[in-house]
Amino acid sequence: MARPHIEPFCDRDEAFKKLILPGLSSGMRYKMLSFDDDTGACSMTTQFDGGYKRAPGFSWSEWEMIIIEGEMKVGDQVWRKGHYCYVPPGYAMPEISSEQGCLALVMYNTGAPSHEESTEHHPLAQVNLYHSVDSFMDIPWAAGNVAKPSVASGCMIKLLNYNPRSHAMTFLYCMTPNFYQDNISYHDCAEEGYHLWGTSWMMQFGDVPTGGYFWRPAYINHGAFASEYGCIALGRTDSKLFNHFHYNPWSTPVQNADRSEARIYQRDPLLYKWAFSKDHNHPHGPEDFEDTMVRRGDEQGHDLEQFKTQGKTHDHWHGHDHHAPESEHHHHHHGDGEDHHHHHHD
């Protein structure tokens, strides 16, 4: 999903615009939250005006929606605040209307907003994937440890949608009053969030109030986190959510990505060798900045003055110099107690 980093942003600072697209009924207004220039996929705060009505039909894009305020009639059902739906491409929805008007968060995931009038599903539609639920009333809160390592206690979730192939998720999350988590996080996936109610605080971006929104591509630092009075928000990821926690606020997205790769190398060396190093029988692992960064306090014998003046040229306490001229490719691998010489042939 090629959307730029958007953070911080609050839709309360923007005015609604009329949504005029072929097939979509008049009476819709929107605030664009994020937009994919490649596919037309987008997330919008959408106002359905009083008296709005749309004929039965389907979209060429999968889409999701959660009601923020008001009521919407969908077929013979009435959806109220907190009602959520996931609609696969080609799934024909019944007539949609709103007598008094309705505010919703609408997300088109795989293409631009579209509507083809039809009372029948498209022949290729995966109709079994459709679902809707009153997320406020009919789903209990669960501990936020769906992803491990987990966030601090006091952050809870309700899982709304899950893709078993990509592990992409849509979920509600809440922070209890006085929630606090002091570390920094990044992920291997894009992450999206919209505050339905309440304010949270993030070290890099400040307060995120009601109507606050972010689209955060992979490997961007965020946190520490806090919420004085609590908040509730909708969150989404485009693949598996894994919390890479650390305490270095100056690491870059490139360094964070290298660290993620390093953790694969450390955790699954055979997988790493197969996936990344098919033509090299002794791969050198990528850098994990937490293993190499200079730390305050006990430096375990590192010559800090030499480090400061000569960059990475430094002697370790165990008594050898990686950069000595006579041992240009001489490495000591911690843990096996053996010296290994690597001969590189051109």
What are these regions (language model features)?
Residues 280-289, 293-346:
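Histidine-centered metal-binding segments
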Residues 28, 78-79, 89-118, 189, ...:
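Ligand-binding loop in jelly-roll beta-barrel domains
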Residues 69-70, 197-199:
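Glycine-centered positions in the ABC transporter ATPase nucleotide-binding domain
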Residues 1-38, 114-167, 259-308:
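A short, N-terminal "cap"/entry segment at the start of jelly-roll beta-barrel domains
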Residues 65:
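Structured binding elements
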Residues 24-59, 73, 77-81, 88, ...:
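Conserved short histidine dyad/triad with adjacent acidic residue
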